[in-house]
Amino acid sequence: MHEYYRKNAPKFKKSMINLLKPVAPEVELHTGRDFAAVSEEIWRHYEKNMLAYFPYIGGDTVSGTKNLTGAYCFVSMGEVLKRYGVGMEEIGRLMTLAYERKMGKMPGFIGALLRKACKTPGLLDRIFVKKDAKNAANAAKNPGSFETKTVIPPEKGYAFSYHNLVCPLSEFAKAHRYGAYMPYLCNLDYVMFGVFGVPLFREHTCFEDGDYCDFKIRLGAKPLDAWPPVFAQGKGYK
């Protein structure tokens, strides 16, 4: 285990419980146990199988660390729920539900600001080009961390287009056989954008296609529902 994860384990445990607590009633129903007891079981799995093997990708200095550590809380929840006979689709539903309930508590002004920014694609381009440079500098120091590219001009039919070229979540899933979770983890992006009222569309993922994961915004479109999962809706999006 990298020293960063060892030192911050109490913080990660607190974050994990806060992330999963919104589906405490469903977890208790499936397991027949109190959420406090199940969350301890999930934490033990997470500490042993996730924290012990996570790559160091920049720690608190980069947002990607929170993406990696947060996403795999859901995977540990799923691995524990499997012990109680819960299937992958229901696990995916609980992942989506937990994130929806958590994101639903975000202040409304954040979504308003994001929607306003999306109506000014040039502003988004400038913001994300700076993020590309920051990610590239971090990746030079910490190989395997997120690498991104803002597509200018954006892909045809979209106001904004952004690619993840390297995704630590995908690489960790491949290395540790958590691939069944990746479509559901990617689907959580639709939860976040949907809560903010931003119409996200994706046709590529690093895990499935091996090239990049795209984030595309089409102004004036209706955000896709996050459940049933977008990849199962038959619209060609992932």
Where are these regions (language model features)?
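Short, charged/polar, Gly/Pro-enriched secondary-structure boundary elements
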Residues: L169-E171, A221-A226
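N-terminal, charged low-complexity regulatory/assembly segments
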Residues: M1-Y84
